[in-house]
Design a protein with these regions (language model features):
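Short, charged/polar "capping" segments at the starts of alpha-helices
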Residues: 38-41, 135
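Conserved beta-strand positions in the Rossmann-like core of class I SAM-dependent methyltransferases
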Residues: 29-31
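Active-site nucleotide/adenylate-binding loops and adjacent lid/helix of ATP-dependent enzymes
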Residues: 103-164
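Short, polar loop motifs at secondary-structure junctions
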Residues: 33-39, 80-81
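N-terminal Rossmann NAD(P)H-binding glycine-rich loop of SDR-like oxidoreductase domains
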Residues: 10
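Extreme N-terminal starter segment of soluble prokaryotic enzymes
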Residues: 1-4
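Surface-exposed amphipathic alpha-helices with a cationic face
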Residues: 14-25, 67, 87-90
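Conserved N-proximal alpha/beta basic substrate-recognition cap immediately N-terminal to
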Residues: 42-128
């Protein structure tokens, strides 16, 4: 039985990743972490562990302790913020993971949109709103809506607002 550690397992991405694993096979023992004790309840995992935030200096050490305790075969960091920290510390991680170098992980949603667009991948029409005065011009340019206003960085739909 393979043992997988899913960080951020309580967020929608983590929940969906775990569901996909369970559809594929029941031969996984899944340890899930999340810093939010309430979100942690959402995932269908075998072991729940409240974690420090990815910005905590002890985050990598925390993951290594879990890896050792549960004999984890693979770490899947779900939110991009945690993937970035783990990618920056690949030499310190004591088990397998599949991550690109930190310079490849973009946490800037606008930059990600530009990269995807240049690769020919369809993306939503995107405009930057730098100040309050630009809002009316954006609606004139894009039409009446609905439109999403999003923060450039963050996870879990943080600061998302649907506007009509």
């Amino acid at each position: 039985m393979k043992k997988i550690l899913v960080t951020g397992s309580g967020g929608i991405g983590g929940v969906n990743f775990v569901r996909a694993l369970k559809i594929f096979s029941d031969k996984f023992f899944i340890v899930g972490t999340d810093f939010n004790k309430y979100y942690l309840q959402f995932a269908d995992i075998d072991q729940r562990i409240i974690s420090p935030k990815h910005s905590d200096p002890d985050f990598i050490n925390f993951l290594n302790k879990i890896t050792e305790k549960y004999k984890i075969d693979f770490i899947h960091p779900q939110p991009s913020s945690e993937a970035l920290v783990i990618s920056q510390n690949l030499d310190s991680i004591t088990t397998k993971t599949l991550l690109p170098p930190p310079n490849v992980i973009s946490t800037d949603k606008l930059e990600t949109q530009k990269i995807l667009s240049k690769l020919g991948i369809f993306v939503a029409k995107t405009k930057v709103i730098a100040n309050y005065e630009m809002i009316s011009n954006i609606f004139e340019e894009l039409g009446s809506g609905p439109h999403w206003i999003r923060a450039k960085t963050g996870a879990g739909g943080n600061l998302s607002l649907l506007c009509n």
